[in-house]
From Swiss-Prot:
It comes from the Bacteria. This is Succinate--CoA ligase [ADP-forming] subunit beta. GO terms for molecular function: ATP binding; magnesium ion binding; succinate-CoA ligase (ADP-forming) activity; succinate-CoA ligase (GDP-forming) activity. It catalyses: succinate + ATP + CoA = succinyl-CoA + ADP + phosphate; GTP + succinate + CoA = succinyl-CoA + GDP + phosphate. Substrate binds at N264, G321, I322, V323. The gene is sucC. It holds the Pfam family ATP-grasp_2.
Length: 388
């Protein structure tokens, strides 16, 4: 689950980290009032969406009057912001963050993720702040500094000081960085985060460090023990299809292709998408129906896939283990009849009673193409999507 910038900064402040004074508002009038509360003559107004690239898309602006802040809120509230990280529809803007202006001397990067290979929280820092860390990692990986957190003792101040020295910080900045480093690590562990970024972490004109942005992603598997963070969830930022799928315990992620994919098992689903790509197709989604591919779940899966108007064909790839393939085939047939699927459906069944499942599909009289292998399934669905 992602948090908005203003929510992330709220957590930062609770851990004593330096953030700008600001208010999240949902009306133009409140934006003007926020300027009065903050004081000063310049403010930064930011559209709140779960996506990066807001500045280039016009979603972040420096304003020098309350009228300009109000006009910015009128421009964006209730609208959708399209950035390079969103789809063509963009994300709805329901909040505007109004905060004090910061005089920036230098921008740094500080972030943390769970590293699967070391099974540790790993902090990353760089002198290249304010840009995409992925681009830095690809083009100049030597500019990314790392510190691994021991889960038994947590982040240690000396690790923060080491990173600070490597970043070229001096004097009071070293102690400030160490405090921010330890605070962020504690925040990461306390709230079961999957990702945390301060981009940029800035050096102000007076030499002090300041957290100018906040990006936080919480591990969805740990939400049951984070009741406070559950209240931070903004459903307006969710893809409606993904939200609907979650109600039926279906793991769905919308993509931009034209071949719908329905698979049982996350690994098999990723492999299926890869082989579709290999044969010239473009998956329209990732969809894992899980171990229990019942008629009800398959039916809902078809409904979700077909809600995407770009889908020209569907590939169903099921491995029968505990659940028999003939039962799965009957579920697919029932779902196709109930939903009224008009586009080609290619089905590959493997495992328990696979031959019987293929026979059931062949005798159904429906527009279902039984594939003999995964390669055959990929080739068949690509042809079907192209109308061949």
């Amino acid at each position: 689950m992602n948090l908005h910038e203003y929510q992330g900064k709220q957590l930062f402040a609770e851990y004593g980290l330096p953030v700008s004074k600001g208010y999240a508002v949902d009306t133009p009038e409140a934006a003007a009032e926020a300027c009065d509360k903050i004081g000063g003559t310049e403010w930064v107004v930011k559209a709140q969406v779960h996506a990066g690239g807001r500045g280039k898309a016009g979603g972040v602006k420096l304003v020098r009057s309350k009228e300009d802040a109000k006009a910015f809120a009128q421009q964006w509230l209730g609208k959708r912001l399209v950035t390079y990280q969103t789809d063509a529809n963009g994300q709805p803007v329901t909040k505007i963050l109004v905060e004090s202006c910061t005089d920036i001397a230098k921008e740094l990067y500080l972030g943390a993720v769970v590293d699967r290979s070391s099974r540790r929280i790993v902090f990353m820092a760089s002198t290249e702040g304010g840009v995409d860390i992925e681009k830095i990692a690809e083009e100049t990986p030597e500019k990314i500094l790392k510190a691994t957190i021991d889960p038994l003792v947590g982040a240690q101040p000396f690790q923060g000081r080491e990173l600070a020295f490597q970043l070229g910080l001096e004097g009071k900045q070293v102690a400030q960085f160490a405090k921010i480093f330890v605070g962020l690590a504690k925040l990461f562990q306390d709230h079961d985060l999957a990702l945390l970024e301060v981009n940029p972490l800035v050096i102000k004109a007076d030499g002090d460090l300041h957290c100018l942005d906040a990006k936080i992603n919480i591990d969805a598997n740990a939400m049951y023990r984070q009741p406070k963070l559950k209240t931070f969830h903004d459903p307006s930022q969710d893809d409606p299809r993904e939200a609907h799928a979650a109600k039926f315990e279906l793991n769905y992620v919308a993509l931009e292709g034209n071949i719908g994919c329905m698979v049982n098992g996350a690994g098999l689903a990723m492999g299926t998408m890869d082989i579709v790509n290999l044969h010239g197709g473009k998956p329209a989604n990732f969809l894992d129906v899980g171990g229990g591919a019942t008629k009800e779940r398959v039916t809902e899966a078809f409904k979700i896939i077909l809600s995407d108007s770009n889908v020209a064909a569907v590939l169903v790839n099921i491995f029968g283990g505990i659940v028999r393939c003939d039962m799965i085939a009957e579920g697919i047939i029932g779902a196709v009849k109930e939903v009224g699927v008009k586009i080609p459906v290619v089905v590959r069944l493997e495992g328990n009673n696979a031959e019987l499942g293929a026979k059931v599909l062949a005798e159904s009289g429906l527009n279902i193409i039984a594939a003999t292998s995964l390669t055959d399934a990929a080739q068949q669905v690509v042809k079907a999507a192209e109308g061949k």
